[in-house]
Amino acid sequence: MTGLDRKKDDEIIEVLRMMAPGTSLREGLDNILLARTGALIVIGDSEKVLSLVDGGFYINKDYTPAHIYELAKMDGAIILSKDLKKILYANALLVPDTSIPTAETGTRHKTADRVAKQTGEVVVSISQRRNIITIYMGSRKYILRETPVILAEANQALQTLEKYKVALVEAINNLNILEIEDIVTLDDVAFVLQRTEMLMRVAAEIERYISELGSEGRLISLQLDELLTNVDADELFIIEDYAIRTDLRSDEILEKLRQLSYDELMNLVNICSILGYSPNADAFEMVISPRGYRLLSKIPRVPVNIIRNLVKKFSNLQGILNASIEELDDVAGIGEVRARIIWDGLRRVQEQIFLDSRKL
């Protein structure tokens, strides 16, 4: 998923949340669906939308599922306010530009598609004959599906995510050992970032399912949160540890990674280039030392500004690991108590890493 795809996905997620099961809007849509009356609903009252309205009734009443259900019995379109609090117009005739191309066949769906493309607003078309709800957003189209179908797909995606998480944990555990022994290669770092991005892209897909499921997606959401614990933070700290380019901040480098297409992500050269390394075969075998952000973040009660001071003082993880309590105490913002906490914390982190390595 590229950055543009991710942005579009975020937009559709917001729309799906508006009409997910358990919401007032979805209740109204489901009532219309059950009554088989069909409907054309525009969400938004911008000047572009109102310029397409011909006739109808100005309602300006609070939105309720019962009100929209009754108004849908009339043939014309219903115009809702952007915040979904008001029903503004009912039985309105929409007159979009007929030169706007559309692949839709039915009159209602053609109008919905053209209005969405012309105004950029969300338009909902409920088919009287096929009994389905179709959402139009700009040039995008999305058909709402039944909850059991979405749940099945979400659970399948969760299984894939669990497999990716196992692979990522193995890669991270391997990186931990290599960092302690100071034998990390660029290839090792790129591989971990690749695995992380693969996992995050499946997670983005599951987030869309959760948005569409609404109140039915609580369990899926809890499972997703558990699987993603520390993944985002670790990815950013890995970039902090290894990126050598100075023209971008770590979060901007992360965004560059997330803009890679799937095929680009599969080529580790692209990841290395984003980190600032020369894209050649020899670079993969280059031994590089982490600055220490990620492993230091595992020590409780050590804020990021203190970690930055440590990195500034000792340059890299090995320098920090080899520092005495007295040397740690000399770092800005670190007193004797915190120096002891950091020194002991690093020892515990190393012990845990060696314990985890035996499970590999």
From Swiss-Prot:
> Which amino acids does the record list as binding ATP?
G76, L94, T107, R108, H109, K110, T111
Keyword Transmembrane included in the entry's annotation: no
Q: Which residues form the DAC domain?
A: 9-147
Q: GO biological process: what's one of them?
A: DNA repair
Catalytic activity, reaction form: 2 ATP = 3',3'-c-di-AMP + 2 diphosphate
Q: InterPro entries this protein is in?
A: DisA (IPR050338), DisA_sf (IPR038331), DNA_integrity_DisA_N_sf (IPR036888), DNA_integrity_scan_DisA_link (IPR018906), DNA_integrity_scan_DisA_N (IPR003390), DNA_integrity_scanning_protein (IPR023763), RuvA_2-like (IPR010994)
Family matches, as Pfam families: DAC, DisA-linker
The family note in this entry says:
Belongs to the DisA family.
Kindly give the PANTHER family that the UniProt entry links to this protein.
DIADENYLATE CYCLASE, DNA INTEGRITY SCANNING PROTEIN DISA
Question: Mind telling me which NCBIfam families this protein's record contains?
Answer: PRK13482.1
What the protein does?
A: Participates in a DNA-damage check-point that is active prior to asymmetric division when DNA is damaged. DisA forms globular foci that rapidly scan along the chromosomes during sporulation, searching for lesions. When a lesion is present, DisA pauses at the lesion site. This triggers a cellular response that culminates in a temporary block in sporulation initiation.
Protein name per the record: DNA integrity scanning protein DisA
Q: Which organism is it from?
A: Acetivibrio thermocellus (strain ATCC 27405 / DSM 1237 / JCM 9322 / NBRC 103400 / NCIMB 10682 / NRRL B-4536 / VPI 7372)
